[in-house]
Protein backbone atom coordinates (compact mmCIF):
# COMPACT_ATOMS: atom_id res chain seq x y z
CA UNK A 1 0.00 0.00 0.00
CA UNK A 2 2.81 2.46 0.73
CA UNK A 3 4.33 1.82 -2.68
CA UNK A 4 1.80 4.24 -4.17
CA UNK A 5 3.05 7.21 -2.14
CA UNK A 6 6.22 9.09 -3.09
CA UNK A 7 8.87 9.10 -0.37
CA UNK A 8 11.57 11.70 -0.05
CA UNK A 9 14.07 9.16 1.30
CA UNK A 10 14.68 5.48 0.47
CA UNK A 11 12.91 2.99 2.74
CA UNK A 12 13.83 -0.63 3.26
CA UNK A 13 11.36 -3.14 4.72
CA UNK A 14 13.79 -4.89 7.05
CA UNK A 15 11.14 -7.26 8.39
CA UNK A 16 10.98 -8.96 4.98
CA UNK A 17 14.74 -9.37 4.60
CA UNK A 18 16.12 -12.92 4.71
CA UNK A 19 18.74 -11.79 7.21
CA UNK A 20 15.88 -10.71 9.50
CA UNK A 21 13.83 -13.89 9.31
CA UNK A 22 16.71 -16.37 9.21
CA UNK A 23 18.78 -14.75 11.93
CA UNK A 24 16.91 -12.19 14.01
CA UNK A 25 13.72 -14.27 14.23
CA UNK A 26 15.49 -17.59 14.73
CA UNK A 27 18.14 -16.42 17.17
CA UNK A 28 17.46 -12.92 18.44
CA UNK A 29 13.75 -13.38 19.12
CA UNK A 30 14.23 -16.69 20.91
CA UNK A 31 16.96 -15.23 23.10
CA UNK A 32 15.10 -11.99 23.85
CA UNK A 33 11.91 -13.89 24.70
CA UNK A 34 13.76 -16.04 27.21
CA UNK A 35 15.52 -12.99 28.66
CA UNK A 36 12.11 -11.40 29.19
CA UNK A 37 10.57 -14.58 30.62
CA UNK A 38 13.43 -14.93 33.09
CA UNK A 39 13.26 -11.24 34.05
CA UNK A 40 9.54 -11.62 34.76
CA UNK A 41 9.49 -14.95 36.61
CA UNK A 42 12.78 -14.42 38.46
CA UNK A 43 13.10 -10.66 39.08
CA UNK A 44 15.42 -11.17 42.06
CA UNK A 45 17.77 -13.24 39.86
CA UNK A 46 17.89 -16.07 42.39
CA UNK A 47 17.52 -18.80 39.81
CA UNK A 48 14.41 -19.50 37.77
CA UNK A 49 13.21 -23.11 37.90
CA UNK A 50 13.78 -23.72 34.19
CA UNK A 51 16.15 -26.73 34.41
CA UNK A 52 13.97 -29.82 34.24
CA UNK A 53 10.75 -27.86 33.65
CA UNK A 54 8.45 -29.30 30.98
CA UNK A 55 7.92 -26.53 28.44
CA UNK A 56 5.69 -26.58 25.39
CA UNK A 57 6.54 -24.42 22.39
CA UNK A 58 3.67 -24.04 19.94
CA UNK A 59 4.94 -23.46 16.42
CA UNK A 60 8.28 -24.43 14.89
CA UNK A 61 8.82 -21.57 12.47
CA UNK A 62 11.84 -19.33 12.93
CA UNK A 63 10.60 -17.84 16.23
CA UNK A 64 9.51 -21.22 17.60
CA UNK A 65 12.87 -22.76 16.72
CA UNK A 66 14.66 -20.00 18.61
CA UNK A 67 12.37 -20.35 21.63
CA UNK A 68 12.85 -24.12 21.66
CA UNK A 69 16.64 -23.93 21.27
CA UNK A 70 17.17 -21.33 23.99
CA UNK A 71 14.72 -23.09 26.31
CA UNK A 72 16.68 -26.32 25.90
CA UNK A 73 19.97 -24.45 26.46
CA UNK A 74 18.54 -23.24 29.79
CA UNK A 75 17.82 -26.83 30.80
CA UNK A 76 14.13 -26.96 29.95
CA UNK A 77 12.55 -30.19 28.73
CA UNK A 78 11.10 -28.84 25.49
CA UNK A 79 8.23 -30.36 23.54
CA UNK A 80 6.94 -28.85 20.31
CA UNK A 81 3.42 -28.57 18.92
CA UNK A 82 3.54 -28.19 15.15
CA UNK A 83 0.75 -28.86 12.65
CA UNK A 84 2.94 -28.67 9.53
CA UNK A 85 4.34 -32.20 9.05
CA UNK A 86 7.64 -31.00 7.56
CA UNK A 87 8.30 -28.58 10.42
CA UNK A 88 7.24 -31.27 12.90
CA UNK A 89 9.80 -33.60 11.32
CA UNK A 90 12.42 -30.86 11.54
CA UNK A 91 11.66 -30.43 15.25
CA UNK A 92 12.09 -34.18 15.76
CA UNK A 93 15.36 -34.15 13.81
CA UNK A 94 16.51 -31.25 16.01
CA UNK A 95 15.97 -33.50 19.03
CA UNK A 96 12.63 -32.22 20.33
CA UNK A 97 9.61 -34.27 21.30
CA UNK A 98 6.65 -33.45 19.06
CA UNK A 99 3.14 -34.04 20.38
CA UNK A 100 -0.37 -32.64 20.28
CA UNK A 101 -1.30 -29.52 22.21
CA UNK A 102 -3.57 -31.51 24.53
CA UNK A 103 -0.74 -33.93 25.40
CA UNK A 104 1.79 -31.18 26.02
CA UNK A 105 -0.57 -28.85 27.92
CA UNK A 106 -1.48 -31.59 30.39
CA UNK A 107 2.10 -31.76 31.67
CA UNK A 108 3.66 -28.37 30.84
CA UNK A 109 4.98 -26.03 33.49
CA UNK A 110 5.14 -23.38 30.76
CA UNK A 111 3.39 -22.97 27.42
CA UNK A 112 4.81 -20.56 24.83
CA UNK A 113 2.91 -19.54 21.70
CA UNK A 114 5.30 -18.82 18.84
CA UNK A 115 2.89 -18.87 15.91
CA UNK A 116 1.73 -15.31 15.36
CA UNK A 117 -1.76 -16.75 14.87
CA UNK A 118 -4.90 -16.12 16.95
CA UNK A 119 -6.29 -18.83 19.25
CA UNK A 120 -3.01 -20.73 19.43
CA UNK A 121 -3.62 -21.43 23.12
CA UNK A 122 -7.34 -22.20 23.26
CA UNK A 123 -9.50 -22.49 26.35
CA UNK A 124 -9.22 -26.29 26.43
CA UNK A 125 -5.40 -25.97 26.62
CA UNK A 126 -5.72 -23.52 29.53
CA UNK A 127 -8.05 -26.00 31.23
CA UNK A 128 -5.52 -28.82 30.72
CA UNK A 129 -2.51 -26.96 32.14
CA UNK A 130 -1.40 -27.85 35.67
CA UNK A 131 -1.73 -25.47 38.62
CA UNK A 132 0.60 -22.44 38.47
CA UNK A 133 1.74 -23.09 34.88
CA UNK A 134 3.12 -20.12 32.96
CA UNK A 135 1.38 -19.01 29.75
CA UNK A 136 3.16 -16.61 27.42
CA UNK A 137 3.34 -15.40 23.82
CA UNK A 138 6.67 -14.92 22.05
CA UNK A 139 5.30 -12.14 19.89
CA UNK A 140 2.78 -11.79 17.17
CA UNK A 141 -0.90 -11.00 17.22
CA UNK A 142 -3.52 -10.25 19.82
CA UNK A 143 -5.63 -13.20 20.85
CA UNK A 144 -3.03 -15.96 20.66
CA UNK A 145 -4.16 -16.91 24.17
CA UNK A 146 -7.93 -17.29 24.39
CA UNK A 147 -8.12 -15.53 27.73
CA UNK A 148 -11.18 -13.49 26.66
CA UNK A 149 -12.96 -16.80 26.04
CA UNK A 150 -11.71 -17.98 29.42
CA UNK A 151 -13.20 -14.90 31.09
CA UNK A 152 -16.50 -15.55 29.32
CA UNK A 153 -16.39 -19.12 30.66
CA UNK A 154 -16.09 -17.91 34.26
CA UNK A 155 -12.33 -17.62 34.68
CA UNK A 156 -11.06 -14.53 36.49
CA UNK A 157 -8.05 -12.35 35.76
CA UNK A 158 -6.25 -10.58 38.58
CA UNK A 159 -2.97 -8.74 38.92
CA UNK A 160 -0.17 -10.47 40.77
CA UNK A 161 2.54 -8.72 42.78
CA UNK A 162 4.49 -8.22 39.55
CA UNK A 163 2.72 -5.95 37.01
CA UNK A 164 3.91 -8.23 34.19
CA UNK A 165 2.17 -11.30 35.64
CA UNK A 166 -1.55 -11.83 35.87
CA UNK A 167 -3.31 -14.67 37.64
CA UNK A 168 -5.84 -16.44 35.47
CA UNK A 169 -8.05 -18.56 37.76
CA UNK A 170 -10.50 -21.18 36.57
CA UNK A 171 -13.99 -21.60 38.04
CA UNK A 172 -12.63 -24.70 39.84
CA UNK A 173 -9.92 -22.62 41.52
CA UNK A 174 -6.88 -23.59 39.43
CA UNK A 175 -4.57 -20.62 38.88
CA UNK A 176 -2.23 -19.99 35.94
CA UNK A 177 0.41 -17.29 35.51
CA UNK A 178 -0.28 -15.25 32.37
CA UNK A 179 2.64 -13.07 31.30
CA UNK A 180 1.84 -9.58 29.94
CA UNK A 181 -1.90 -10.35 29.66
CA UNK A 182 -1.16 -12.73 26.81
CA UNK A 183 0.45 -10.05 24.65
CA UNK A 184 3.85 -10.56 23.01
CA UNK A 185 6.80 -10.50 25.40
CA UNK A 186 9.38 -9.84 22.69
Residue ranges and their predicted role:
Residues 1-8:
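Phosphate-/polyanion-interacting regions in eukaryotic proteins
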Residues 30, 34-37, 42-72, 79:
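Glycine-rich adenosine-cofactor-binding loop
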Residues 23, 27, 31, 61, ...:
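Electropositive phosphate-/nucleotide-binding environments in soluble metabolic enzymes
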Residues 92-178, 184:
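Rossmann-like adenosine-cofactor binding region
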Residues 14, 58, 72-94:
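NAD(P)-binding Rossmann-fold cofactor-contacting core
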Residues 16-17, 83-84, 117, 140-141:
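Short, ordered loop/turn segments at secondary-structure junctions
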Residues 62-67, 88-89, 118-122:
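Short glycine/serine/threonine-rich phosphate/pyrophosphate-binding segments
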Residues 10-45, 147-186:
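Adenosine-phosphate binding glycine-rich loop
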